[in-house]
A protein has these predicted regions:
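Selective hydrophobic functional segments
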Residues: 85-138, 142-145, 227-277
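Extreme N-terminal basic, low-complexity initiation segments
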Residues: 2-9
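Transmembrane helix exit motif
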Residues: 97-107, 144-170, 261, 281-294
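Selected transmembrane alpha-helices and immediately adjacent juxtamembrane segments
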Residues: 37-79, 166-216
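Membrane-interface alpha-helices at helix entry/exit sites of multi-pass transporters
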Residues: 80-86, 111, 210-220
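Residue-level signature of the transmembrane alpha-helical core
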Residues: 49, 53, 57, 88, ...
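Hydrophobic alpha-helical transmembrane segments in multi-pass integral membrane proteins
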Residues: 184-191, 230, 283-294
């Protein structure tokens, strides 16, 4: 009887687990525990906030601020997925104000904006889900190769004037191309992000042959939509550090505001050396973590 009593405990426990947590054949067990909270230090604020301010400043002048803001979080020691998720929070804050400003100026055409926004929401959510499936060390290797290519392309981009002078497509053809661009670039933004605004502007003016002002407005709408969709995915996966992201968002808005005023007065001179310096520091740290740190 004593032996039966001892055996009954694990057997009854196993029955309880099977009855309350059924699992299909071939399905891996799901994690039942949420991610552990991460403590944010004062030093991390000191590293992230000024660099995100700088990213907003650069983005307003020449674009490509994401090439600085995402590395900023990783330089502060955040894991890759938390860095991307928290960066989406601060980016969404800045994108909201920028989009509102473009809408107020009349640069957002709703018949393009609404379908492109829907496509960006879908694409970004898919991209973010894919990103969460990739282990951190693999993601760092991807960044080691992708980020310099994106940086080189963004910093060497040519003037958009020639593209904007192309003969416009009929509305139906233009909107189909624009929606496809929003879907695939939205997927890239959810997965990774840096350079999204530049890619969109080049594709909308070149591939969809939209006027430059309309392309700029639709780019802001797509960027905001993809940020919101990716942010939602990262929030539900527990990969957003709210205090750091909100503080960085305020600095990003301030940097964007100052950058707009400086660009009006002096243009984009001096931006490339800033971006090269920040990216150089980030690559040194990334290579050390991948190849030398134990």
């Amino acid at each position: 009887m004593e032996l039966l009593a001892v055996l009954a405990v694990p057997l009854s426990s196993a029955h309880y687990i099977r009855s309350h947590f059924p699992r299909k054949r071939g399905q891996l067990p799901l994690r039942q525990f949420p991610p552990q909270p991460m403590t944010i230090t004062f030093i991390q604020y000191i590293i992230v906030c000024p660099l995100v301010f700088l990213a907003g400043f650069v983005d307003a002048i020449a674009g490509g601020g994401g090439l600085i803001s995402l590395p900023a979080y990783m330089l502060a020691g955040l894991p890759v997925h938390k860095a991307i998720g928290t960066n989406k929070l601060s980016s969404a804050m800045g994108a909201t104000l920028t989009t509102a400003r473009f809408a107020k100026s009349g640069f957002i055409e709703l018949r393009f904006a609404i379908p492109c926004s829907a496509a960006a929401l879908l694409g970004s959510a898919i991209g973010a889900r894919i990103a969460l499936l990739i282990p951190e060390h693999v993601f760092k290797i991807i960044m080691l190769f992708v980020l310099p290519l994106v940086a080189a392309y963004v910093m060497s981009k040519k003037s958009l004037k020639d593209r904007s002078e192309l003969e416009p497509f009929p509305f139906t053809k233009a909107i189909i191309i624009a929606v496809l661009c929003a879907l695939f670039i939205g997927m890239y933004d959810g997965f990774y992000g840096p350079g999204t605004g530049t890619f969109l502007l080049l594709l909308l003016t070149g591939a969809a042959r939209m006027p430059l002002n309309d392309s700029a407005g639709i780019t802001k709408v797509i960027n905001l939509s993809s940020n919101i969709a990716a942010l939602a995915v990262y929030i539900f996966s527990g990969n957003v550090l709210y205090p750091l992201g909100l503080a960085a968002g305020v600095f990003s808005i301030a940097g964007n505001y100052l950058g707009t005023r400086v660009f009006t007065a002096k243009g984009s001179r001096g931006v490339k050396p800033i971006m090269i310096t920040v990216l150089g520091i980030f690559f040194i740290k990334l290579r050390y973590e991948l190849f030398f740190a134990k």
